[in-house]
Regions:
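Extended amphipathic alpha-helical coiled-coil/heptad-repeat regions
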Residues: 570-777
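Amphipathic alpha-helical "lid/sensor" segments that cap RecA-like P-loop NTPase cores
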Residues: 280, 301-327, 367-447
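Conserved P-loop NTPase "ATPase switch" module shared by AAA+ and STAND
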Residues: 203-261, 265-270, 274-275
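P-loop NTPase Walker A phosphate-binding motif
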Residues: 183-201
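Long, low-complexity intrinsically disordered regions enriched in small/polar
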Residues: 3-4, 63-141, 697
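Pre-Walker A adenine-sensing motif
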Residues: 156-167
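C-terminal leucine-rich, beta-strand-based interaction scaffolds used for sensing/assembly
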Residues: 438-472, 476-479, 483-597, 601-626
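Walker A/P-loop nucleotide-binding motif
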Residues: 170-186
Length: 885
C-alpha cells in the first residue's frame, strides 16, 4: 500500500495561479501542465538529448527548491549562526511588557513642569523644592510649636516602640531610610518623647538640630563641653551628608564616643542617614535601625481630615487636633522644611481617621466641579469624610496618582487636592492633573542637582575637588533609569544594566579618570528602597523556556514614564551617556533587555524626535546585525503609537522601503510588520512587496515574516486576499513572496508574532501554529487558508518545505501526554485541504511516511484519528482505514 501511495503522488504543477474554488479538471493553484510531460522524446533518435534536458530541468528544480528553502530561514538569526533559533516569542512578550510599563500616564503630565519647586492647584500652594539641601541647616533649636505639632500628628510607623526603647537604652540611634519616607519626622518624634519628661523637659530648646557639616566627632565634643549653655537631657538630630564624594562615614569608635558623651550629659541623639553602601556599616552596628515608612492610608486619612476641618470650620475640631493617643490627628501645610520633606508634612498618629461610607459612586455627578457641591450641601464634616473616601477610591483618581504608596508630602498634597475638590476650589481636571503630578515631582527630586558636589569649585586651600566617588554618587540615579527602562525584567538584568549606565555617567562626568567600580558594595535592599521598587517572583524567558526568577518593578505605574520624561526633558547633558548605554542594551542577546530598551528608546524619541532619530533610530537601523535593526524598528513603531508622531514615522518607513539601503529596507520591513507604520493595510502590503521582490528577492525572507505578523491583526482577510493575488502574479518574485509567507504561516507559533495578552482567542493558543489557530478562531477564513496552503503543496519549488510543514501540523494534533493540542484547528483545516481524491491520496501517503519514520514513528491510533479528521465518514473506505488509519 505504501508503494502505491508513493506512485500515486500527484505531479508537480508549475507556476501557481490562485482560484477561489477548485476546478475538477485542474489543481487549485492553476498549472502550466505537467513538467514531466516535457520529458517525452520527440523522436527515437533524440533520447540522449532529451535525457540531458530532463536532467538539467531536474537540477534547476532542485536549485529552485533550495533557493526557496533558503528564503524560509529565520531572518532574525545572526549571520554567523543561522541554524540557531531565535526566541521571537520571548521578544514579543518583552515588548508587550515594556509597552505596558510606559503606557500609564504618558503625555498626561498636566501641570507646569518648568517650576516644579512650587505647585499651585486651585487655591492650594505647596512647596516641593527638592533642591533644599540639608547643608543649609545649622545648629539651632526646634521650635516648641513644631514639637507640639509632631506630638499631636505623627503617625507611628511599624516598630516605633522598638525604636524608642533602643534610643532610651543606648542614648544614640542611627536611623536609616530612603529620603522622603518620614525618617526625619520620626526622629523628631522620638527625641520629643524621650526628652519630654527629662531634665530639660521645660526647656524650650530641648530638641536641637546639629550642623551636618560638623559630623559625629564634633557633635560629641559639643555635648561633652556643653557648648552654648545647653542643658542636660537635650535631644540632638544630625543628618550627615554621607553621599558627598570623598566623605567618610563615622566608624564604630566615633559612635561609641558620642554615645558615651550623651550618657554623661543625660542626652539623646538620632543620626538620620540614607540607606546605601555608605551608611550600611552604621545601620548594621548596634546603634543602627531601619525606619519603616508610615502607612499610606493613615497618612492620607489624617491629612484629609485636617484639611477638611480647616476649611469646613468645625468648631469642635479646628485647631484642636487632639492627642495621638486619643486617635485624633491632624497636620497641615505649615510644617518645617527639612532636607527630605519629611519633617513638616509627616505622619499623624491617628488611627481610624477615615471611615469611608458605602454610598453609590454615581450618586453625585458634578461634571468638572466637585460632586455634590460645597459643604452646605454636604451637611456635615462626617458626610464630607464619607464622600472623600469614595473619591479617594475612584478608579480614575487612583490611575492618575499612579503610585502604590504615598510618602508624607505626597499624602499631604493628595489630601489637599481631594479636600479642594470636595469644597469646590479644585475642578475635576485640576484634581486629576495634580494627581498625575505626584510621580513627576518624585522624578524631579531624584535627579535635581545629583552631581552638584562634583561641580563645586576647588577649596580655597588649593586642593583639587574630590571626584573619586562618582560611581557611588551616580549608581542610585543609574538604577532608577535602568528600572524605568527595564521594569519587569529580572533583578539581575536591571542591576547589571544599572552598573553599565553608572560607568557611562561617570566617564561623561569625568572623562580624564577611570571610574572606580566596587565589586562587593552592592546592597539590593538599598537599591529597592532608594528607587521605590518592589521585587516579585515571575517568569523569565531563558533559551525558549520559562523559569521562575526574581523580577523588579517600580512601586507605581506612573514612575517609569515620569523618570524618562524628567531625564530627557530637563537634563540634556545626560543624553549622550544614556544613548551609548541604550546602544549597548540593543546588543544584549536577552529579549527581556533589548526589547524593553527599544520600547523606551521609542518613548524617548517621541519627546525629541529629531534627537532620537539622529542618535538612536537611524544609526541602529543601518547596523550590520539583525538585533540592532530590530531595536530600531521597535523604537519606530513605539513612536508611531503616538498620534503626534505617526505621520513622521510613516514618512521615514515609506522612504526607506523605496530608496533605502538594504539594511534600511530590512528595518522598514520589521517596522511595517507591527501594522502602524503605513496609512492602511494595503499600503503596508505594497511596501512589504516592494522590499521582498527587489534585488531578486534578497530580502524576501524578512518581508514574508512581516506579512505573517500582519495576519494576527483584525485586517487578516485583506492580507489573505493579497497573498492570493500574489500567487497568480506573473512575476516569480511575487509568487515566491506569497509561497514563502504561506509556508512560514504554518511554521510560526502564535506567541512569536501576537501582541495580544492571554485571554483573547488567539492569545489562548500561544503555542499553536498560526495557520491552525486562525482556522480554529476565524472559521470564515478557513477556505482561503486551505486554498493558499494547497497552492504551496502543489508548487514544485515549495512542495518539499510545504510537506514538512504539513507534517509538523499533523504532529501537533495532540501533546506527548495524549492531551488535545491543535486538534480543533486541524479539524477545521484538513477537510478543506483534502476535498478531492488526489489530495486524500497525498495525505494517505504522508501519514504512512510518518508511521514509518524510525526516529518519530506516528502510532496507528493517531494516524487513524488524523485521517478521520480530514476525510468525512461518507468518503472513507473501510479498507483504507484498515491499511493506514
Amino acid at each position: 500500500m505504501a508503494d502505491e501511495a508513493v506512485a500515486e503522488h500527484p505531479a508537480e504543477p508549475a507556476a501557481p495561479k490562485a482560484k477561489d474554488a477548485r476546478a475538477p479538471e485542474a489543481p487549485r493553484g492553476g498549472a502550466r501542465g505537467d513538467d514531466n510531460a516535457k520529458d517525452a522524446p520527440d523522436a527515437p533518435g533524440s533520447s540522449d538529448a532529451a535525457d540531458a534536458e530532463a536532467a538539467e530541468r531536474e537540477k534547476e528544480r532542485e536549485r529552485a527548491a533550495d533557493r526557496f528553502k533558503d528564503r524560509t530561514r529565520d531572518p532574525l538569526a545572526e549571520e554567523q549562526g543561522e541554524e540557531e533559533p531565535t526566541d521571537a516569542a520571548a521578544a514579543t512578550r518583552a515588548r508587550r511588557s515594556g509597552q505596558k510599563l510606559l503606557a500609564s500616564g504618558r503625555d498626561l503630565i498636566g501641570f507646569d513642569r518648568s517650576d516644579v519647586g512650587r505647585l499651585h492647584i486651585g487655591d492650594i500652594n505647596i512647596g516641593l523644592d527638592a533642591r533644599r539641601s540639608g547643608l543649609s541647616m545649622r545648629d539651632g533649636p526646634v521650635p516648641e510649636e513644631e514639637l507640639l505639632r509632631i506630638r499631636r500628628t505623627h503617625i507611628e510607623p511599624e516598630g516605633y516602640v522598638r525604636l524608642r526603647r533602643a534610643l532610651e537604652a543606648r542614648r544614640l540611634l542611627v536611623l536609616g531610610g530612603a529620603p522622603g519616607t518620614g525618617r526625619a519626622s520620626t526622629a523628631l518624634a522620638l527625641l520629643e518623647e524621650v526628652t519630654r519628661d527629662g531634665e530639660s523637659g521645660q526647656n524650650a530648646e530641648r530638641v536641637r538640630r546639629a550642623d551636618p557639616e560638623r559630623g559625629v566627632r564634633e557633635l560629641a565634643a559639643q555635648v561633652v563641653a556643653g557648648e552654648g549653655g545647653r542643658l542636660r537631657g537635650t535631644g540632638y538630630l544630625l543628618e550627615p551628608a554621607l553621599d558627598r564624594p570623598g566623605t567618610l562615614p563615622p566608624d564604630g569608635m566615633d559612635l561609641d564616643q558620642l554615645a558615651s558623651a550623651l550618657a554623661e550629659r543625660g542626652s539623646y541623639a538620632v543620626v538620620v542617614v540614607s540607606v546605601g553602601s555608605a551608611a550600611n556599616p552604621l545601620l548594621a552596628g548596634r546603634y543602627g535601625a531601619i525606619c519603616p515608612p508610615a502607612p499610606t492610608r493613615e497618612l492620607v486619612a489624617v491629612r484629609l481630615r485636617k484639611r477638611l476641618e480647616e476649611e469646613h470650620g468645625d468648631p469642635v475640631r479646628v485647631g484642636g487636633g487632639g492627642s495621638a493617643r486619643d486617635g485624633d490627628g491632624g497636620g497641615g501645610l505649615d510644617g518645617h522644611a527639612d532636607r527630605d520633606r519629611d519633617g513638616g508634612r509627616d505622619e499623624g498618629r491617628a488611627r481610624g481617621a477615615d471611615q469611608g461610607g458605602d454610598r453609590p459612586r454615581g450618586a453625585d455627578q458634578g461634571g468638572d466641579r466637585p460632586r455634590g457641591g460645597g459643604p452646605d450641601e454636604a451637611g456635615s464634616l462626617s458626610r464630607l469624610l464619607e464622600r472623600a473616601a469614595e473619591l479617594r477610591e475612584d478608579p480614575e483618581v487612583t490611575e492618575a496618582v499612579g503610585l502604590d504608596d504615598l510618602r508624607p508630602a505626597e499624602a499631604e498634597l493628595f489630601a489637599s487636592l481631594l479636600a479642594g475638590h470636595l469644597l469646590g476650589s479644585v475642578g475635576r481636571e485640576e484634581l486629576l492633573s495634580g494627581c498625575r503630578g505626584l510621580a513627576a515631582v518624585q522624578a524631579y527630586e531624584w535627579f535635581a542637582g545629583v552631581d552638584r558636589a562634583l561641580a563645586a569649585p576647588p577649596p580655597g586651600d588649593g586642593r583639587a575637588p574630590v571626584r573619586s566617588g562618582t560611581a557611588a554618587l551616580f549608581h542610585p540615579v543609574a538604577f532608577r533609569i535602568a528600572l524605568a527602562v527595564l521594569g519587569g525584567a529580572s533583578h539581575s538584568a536591571v542591576s547589571a544594566a544599572a552598573h553599565l549606565l553608572t560607568w557611562e555617567l561617570s566617564v561623561q562626568s569625568d572623562p580624564d579618570s577611570t571610574p572606580a567600580r566596587p565589586l562587593f558594595c552592592d546592597d539590593p535592599e538599598s537599591d529597592l528602597a532608594l528607587s521605590r521598587a518592589r521585587p516579585a517572583d515571575g517568569p523569565v524567558d531563558v533559551a525558549g523556556a520559562e523559569v521562575t526568577g526574581r523580577l523588579i518593578f517600580y512601586r507605581g505605574a506612573a514612575l517609569p514614564a515620569a523618570v524618562l520624561a524628567e531625564l530627557w526633558d530637563r537634563h540634556f547633558p545626560v543624553r549622550a551617556p544614556v544613548v551609548r548605554w541604550l546602544r549597548l542594551l540593543a546588543d544584549d542577546p536577552r529579549p527581556q533587555v533589548s526589547m524593553r530598551a527599544a520600547v523606551a528608546a521609542g518613548e524617548l524619541s517621541v519627546r525629541d524626535f529629531e534627537h532620537g532619530y539622529a542618535e538612536l533610530v537611524r544609526p541602529l537601523a543601518e547596523a550590520p546585525t539583525p538585533r540592532r535593526r530590530v531595536f530600531a524598528a521597535t523604537a519606530l513603531d513605539q513612536a508611531a503609537g503616538h498620534a503626534s508622531h505617526r505621520r513622521a514615522v510613516r514618512k521615514v518607513v515609506e522612504d526607506w522601503s523605496r530608496h533605502g539601503t538594504p539594511a534600511l529596507r530590512w528595518t522598514a520591513a520589521m517596522a511595517l510588520g507591527y501594522g502602524r507604520s503605513a496609512d492602511s493595510m494595503d499600503d503596508t502590503l505594497d511596501a512589504l512587496a516592494r522590499i521582498g521582490v527587489r534585488d531578486d528577492g534578497e530580502q524576501l525572507a524578512v518581508a514574508s515574516l512581516n506579512v505573517v505578523r500582519l495576519l494576527t491583526l483584525p485586517e487578516c482577510a485583506t492580507v489573505l486576499r493579497r497573498l492570493a493575488d500574489w500567487t497568480g502574479h506573473r512575476g516569480e518574485e511575487y509568487q515566491d513572496l506569497a509561497l514563502v509567507s504561506i509556508v512560514r504561516l504554518a511554521l510560526t507559533d502564535v506567541d512569536e508574532v501576537l501582541d495580544d495578552e492571554p485571554g483573547t482567542p488567539l492569545g489562548d493558543r500561544g503555542d499553536w501554529p498560526l495557520l491552525l489557530a486562525l482556522a480554529a478562531t476565524r472559521p470564515e477564513l478557513t477556505g482561503k487558508l486551505a486554498d493558499l496552503f494547497w497552492t504551496a503543496l502543489n508548487t514544485a519549488r515549495s512542495r518539499d518545505v510545504a510537506f514538512d510543514a504539513l507534517e509538523t501540523l499533523l504532529r501537533s494534533a495532540s501533546r506527548k501526554d495524549g492531551r488535545a493540542w491543535t486538534r480543533e484547528g486541524l479539524a477545521a483545516l484538513l477537510p478543506a485541504l483534502t476535498a478531492e481524491e488526489h489530495d486524500q491520496r497525498r495525505l494517505k501517503w504522508l501519514l504512512q511516511r510518518m508511521m514509518r519514520d524510525q526516529d518519530r514513528p506516528l502510532t496507528e491510533e493517531r494516524a487513524r484519528a488524523l485521517w478521520r479528521l480530514a476525510v468525512p465518514a461518507r468518503q472513507r473506505r473501510s479498507d483504507e482505514e484498515e491499511s493506514h488509519g
